[in-house]
């Protein structure tokens, strides 16, 4: 009989009645404690990005338990070519909007490039703004071993931290957009990074563009939840950029993106129909007019 490796062994799925995060009975604001408890139950959960109150409200009503106000807003919302130009002021404004648009989801605010790299004190100042001014329930920052001290101080100060290792978009100028953790040395470094952020007190860690087998090993090794994006099916949670997932981004999508709708076409068709009605004089009709 062929034996399955630990990475291939099917993991038990909780019964629907044991769900707490998605499809569960939590009708209050979800907390970090709820997230860590989900790993203990073996409950998987979804996370989506959000950058504005209206979109966030739709996802909140749909039961999405965690939303990331990512610095991916730079590409998807603000018109930048990368995430690097995004400022802390912009992240604070966007995070506050998402918090206002939700009542249940845990909102995680991204610390943008240049807001924590100088050291723990700068990281604390920046994270405090997101918590105090925007009202987020946690912050996210990139880096493994190199961000250990920042994470440690934030957690000691009462600010929950979601770490982010593997492909870290803020380092695109030095790393490029490529799979991380291939090869023995790179895999061992990623494992060290994962353990470092856990030891520093992070409550979860994003694994981006990491070989599925390595992501599975990290997930088995850590006691904190792993959140995959391009990291295979065995992480504790999954995250996608909402404009990719709903087909608004356009162009060629990364291999790991599953497109669940084609909003770009829906919106484009609607805009054209509206324009034709205006030009043709059929809008506004009598039922759209005040008398």
UniProtKB/Swiss-Prot annotation:
Annotated segments matching region Disordered: 1-20
Top EC class for this record: transferase
Binding site for Mg(2+): 71, 110, 142
Subcellular location: Cytoplasm
Gene Ontology MF terms in the entry: 3-methyl-2-oxobutanoate hydroxymethyltransferase activity; magnesium ion binding
Pathway(s): Cofactor biosynthesis; (R)-pantothenate biosynthesis; (R)-pantoate from 3-methyl-2-oxobutanoate: step 1/2
Catalytic activity: 3-methyl-2-oxobutanoate + (6R)-5,10-methylene-5,6,7,8-tetrahydrofolate + H2O = 2-dehydropantoate + (6S)-5,6,7,8-tetrahydrofolate
Keyword Zinc: no
Keywords linked to the UniProt accession: Cytoplasm, Magnesium, Metal-binding, Pantothenate biosynthesis, Transferase
Bridged cysteine pairs (disulfide): none
Active-site residues, Swiss-Prot/TrEMBL: 208
Domain of life: Bacteria
PANTHER family assigned: 3-METHYL-2-OXOBUTANOATE HYDROXYMETHYLTRANSFERASE
Oligomer and partners: Homodecamer; pentamer of dimers.
Family: Belongs to the PanB family.
Name of this protein: 3-methyl-2-oxobutanoate hydroxymethyltransferase
Organism: Streptomyces coelicolor (strain ATCC BAA-471 / A3(2) / M145)
């Amino acid at each position: 009989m062929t034996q399955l490796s630990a990475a291939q062994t099917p993991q038990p799925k909780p019964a629907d009645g044991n769900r707490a995060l998605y499809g569960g009975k939590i009708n209050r604001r979800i907390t970090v404690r709820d997230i860590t408890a989900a790993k203990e139950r073996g409950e998987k959960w979804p996370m989506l990005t959000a950058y504005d109150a209206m979109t966030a409200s739709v996802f909140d009503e749909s039961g999405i338990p965690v939303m990331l106000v990512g610095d991916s807003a730079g590409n998807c919302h603000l018109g930048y070519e990368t995430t690097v130009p995004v400022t802390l002021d912009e992240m604070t404004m966007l995070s506050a909007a998402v918090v206002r648009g939700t009542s249940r989801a845990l909102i995680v605010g991204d610390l943008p490039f240049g807001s924590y790299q100088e050291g723990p004190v700068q990281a604390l100042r920046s994270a405090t703004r997101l918590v105090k001014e925007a009202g987020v329930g946690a912050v996210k920052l990139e880096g493994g071993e190199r961000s250990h001290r920042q994470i440690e101080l934030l957690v000691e100060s009462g600010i929950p931290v979601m770490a982010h290792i593997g492909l870290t978009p803020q380092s695109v100028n030095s790393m490029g957009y490529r799979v991380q953790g291939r090869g023995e040395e790179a895999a061992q470094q990623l494992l060290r990074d994962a353990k470092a952020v856990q030891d520093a007190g992070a409550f979860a860690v994003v694994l981006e563009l990491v070989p599925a087998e390595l992501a599975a090993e990290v997930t088995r090794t850590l006691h904190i939840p792993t959140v995959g994006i391009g990291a295979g099916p065995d992480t504790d949670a999954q995250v996608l950029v909402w404009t990719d997932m709903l087909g608004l981004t356009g162009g060629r999508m990364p291999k790991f993106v599953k497109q669940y709708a084609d909003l770009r076409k829906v919106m484009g068709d609607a805009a054209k129909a509206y324009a034709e009605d205006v030009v043709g004089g059929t809008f506004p009709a009598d039922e759209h007019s005040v008398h």
